[in-house]
Amino acid sequence: MDIIETAKLEEHLENQPSDPTNTYTRPTEPVEEENKNGNGKPKSLSSGLRKGTKKYPDYIQIAMPTESRNKFPLEWWKTGIAFIYAVFNLVLTTVMITVVHERVPPKELSPPLPDKFFDYIDRVKWAFSVSEINGIILVGLWITQWLFLRYKSIVGRRFCFIIGTLYLYRCITMYVTTLPVPGMHFQCAPKLNGDSQAKVQRILRLISGGGLSITGSHILCGDFLFSGHTVTLTLTYLFIKEYSPRHFWWYHLICWLLSAAGIICILVAHEHYTVDVIIAYYITTRLFWWYHSMANEKNLKVSLQTNFLSRAWWFPIFYFFEKNVQGSIPCCFSWPLSWPPGCFKSSCKKYSRVQKIGEDNEKST
């Protein structure tokens, strides 16, 4: 009886029609047809995966998501434009100082204006040298820190744009209003009275000496509103703190002390009116905070009716520099120069996962 039942079962299975829903058949549709139907592989598949699928047709192609674009593109060419902008305004400042110097009234005819700080604090001769030395130290620390930043191109263009804009403001303020010297100790260079060649020599002397008194290049008067030394001391500290790790509190404290002491020494030396320092500090900090708030917040990069920051005259320049930067820049450091150079690095053959598994299967068979 068992033999008869087995024979009937086999006969029943042979006569039963095959159900296509219970089997899997690999589609034989060509790749061109798949691409037309929208089922083809995306263009972003790596070349290794394409080669692997051709060599091993038994593997099923899986569409991988495309890589997101770089959130922090370097764009060094934009940094170059910002650098030219900063250099132009710095040179323009020296030209403006030379022009304004000819309009400064003699201290015998126009004595220094009253200043409350000067009323209570007597002048200390060496204080201004301390201020300039502190500024040189802060600039040196900032340049060294900037060289080791991973995204130095983005940070560099921000620094160049901000300092260039600040010195552009300084050119305007010193030109529209000429203040008398803050103290009777000032020894201003003689006026040239239209000697263009001598003015060019003074401009070159200012540029070569960095406009510092300790280098003997700061011999002109009239650049009192607002203080360029305060701009440098404040801005370098702000950038040092912003683009360094938060747990470097000791580093931030040292830089803050250098900046604060330098600003106080400007007033102690009676080289600038108190209002010069206050205005310089206010404009520098506002411009730095406004720019970085707009750069770090995506909604502030759009010119909207409710975004009042976008009404600044420099917003189109800001958008040009920052439109491709997505979010806040992470505090990352790297060596300024990669070693060994790319031409000395040995090229290694890269395998995709499909190729590696396929070759392992061939070896096992």
From Swiss-Prot:
It comes from the Eukaryota. Residues 1-14 have a biased composition (Basic and acidic residues). Residues 15-26 have a biased composition (Polar residues). It catalyses: an N-acylsphing-4-enine + a 1,2-diacyl-sn-glycero-3-phosphocholine = a sphingomyelin + a 1,2-diacyl-sn-glycerol; an N-acylsphinganine + a 1,2-diacyl-sn-glycero-3-phosphocholine = an N-acylsphinganine-1-phosphocholine + a 1,2-diacyl-sn-glycerol; an N-acyl-(4R)-4-hydroxysphinganine + a 1,2-diacyl-sn-glycero-3-phosphocholine = an N-acyl-(4R)-4-hydroxysphinganine-phosphocholine + a 1,2-diacyl-sn-glycerol; an N-acylsphing-4-enine + a 1,2-diacyl-sn-glycero-3-phosphoethanolamine = an N-acylsphing-4-enine 1-phosphoethanolamine + a 1,2-diacyl-sn-glycerol. The chain crosses the membrane at residues 80-100, 128-148, 159-179, 218-240, 248-268, 273-290. GO terms for cellular component: endoplasmic reticulum membrane; Golgi membrane; plasma membrane. Sphingomyelin synthase that primarily contributes to sphingomyelin synthesis and homeostasis at the plasma membrane. Catalyzes the reversible transfer of phosphocholine moiety in sphingomyelin biosynthesis: in the forward reaction transfers phosphocholine head group of phosphatidylcholine (PC) on to ceramide (CER) to form ceramide phosphocholine (sphingomyelin, SM) and diacylglycerol (DAG) as by-product, and in the reverse reaction transfers phosphocholine from SM to DAG to form PC and CER. The direction of the reaction appears to depend on the levels of CER and DAG in the plasma membrane. Its main location: membrane. The lineage of its organism: Eukaryota, Metazoa, Chordata, Craniata, Vertebrata. The active site is at H229, H272, D276. Its EC number is 2.7.8.27. Coiled coil: none annotated. Palmitoylated on Cys-331, Cys-332, Cys-343 and Cys-348; which plays an important role in plasma membrane localization. A lipid is attached at C331, C332, C343, C348 (S-palmitoyl cysteine). It is a multi-pass membrane protein. Keywords: Cell membrane, Golgi apparatus, Kinase, Lipid metabolism, Lipoprotein, Membrane, Palmitate, Sphingolipid metabolism, Transferase, Transmembrane, Transmembrane helix. The gene is SGMS2. It is found in: Cell membrane; Golgi apparatus membrane. This is Phosphatidylcholine:ceramide cholinephosphotransferase 2.
